[in-house]
Amino acid sequence: MGCGESQQSTTSANPSTVKTSDISIHEAVVEAEDPFVFHVTGRLQIPADDGQQGVATDGKFIYVQNTQQLFKYDLDGKLVTAGPKLMLHHGGIVYVKGLVYAAVSGCDSNGTNQHRVHVYNAQSLELIEKHDIGAHFTVCAGGITHRKGHFFVAESFFDDDHLDKIVEFNASFQHIKDYRIDFKSPYGIQGLEYLPGIDQFQIHSHGKVFYRINGRFESNSLISGKANFELQDLARLDANTLIVNNRQAQTLEFVKLATYPD
């Protein structure tokens, strides 16, 4: 579950029963402020018994992080394998060179120093490494992404009153720099992805609000938008397509970026 939410019971479903549902580009349109016009070109139904959190892809498989368990699907939505069910809150994930990195936290509204990055073998989903990043977060380590050998981990909250915070680490998760962005995402940042073609980050709140910001996190470069469903994590499939978590619908949305360069 996202920070600020109480756990709600959902109908448990076997992820192996995933079905795909192709939809017309005109049937579901997510419109936002110029230049953002997102067209949902496809959808996968991904049943979850403890809430979708993160999503990542290597272009051949899709990795879906539920609150306490990681799953691997092919691009048609067929379950390939499932990782171990673990404790603590698991949030955003990112795929890098055969590994899946997950932001993990105690996620306590009163504050906690339990913040880690878990590292999984992308083929088997075996948990192979943990990095302690507890000194750099206070509530919940939420989203995670990667750029040019460095990792960027964002904080999420239980309210809408905090400026967005992103922490940069090197490849060994040694601290590099903190960034404060002049924007207050609802419940903080739930997902972020680096878009190399335009040197921007796309950042998702836990509400319908999202934005793009340049690679230096300069607030004056920020352009915000608004989706028509509550957001979570996202992953770049290719130069034209994002995969966006729609947790409430238990789907993955394939979103065409109408203004994204080839």
Residue map of PLM features:
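A short helix->beta-strand "capping" segment at the edge of beta-propeller domains
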Residues: 24-49
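A short beta-strand motif characteristic of beta-propeller blades
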Residues: 39-46, 78-84, 126-134, 174-183, ...
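Beta-strand-rich domains and repeat architectures in extracellular enzymes and scaffolds
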Residues: 41-68, 89-92
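Repeated scaffold domains used in trafficking and secretory/extracellular systems
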Residues: 49-54, 87-97, 135-146, 184-194, ...
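Short coil/turn segments that connect the beta-strands within blades of beta-propeller domains
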Residues: 59-60, 97-98, 148-150, 197-199, ...
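Structural motif
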Residues: 70-71, 109-118, 160-167, 208-213, ...
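Short loop/turn segments that connect beta-strands within beta-propeller blades
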Residues: 74-78, 121-125, 170-174, 214-218, ...
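Blade-loop segments of beta-propeller domains
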Residues: 78-115
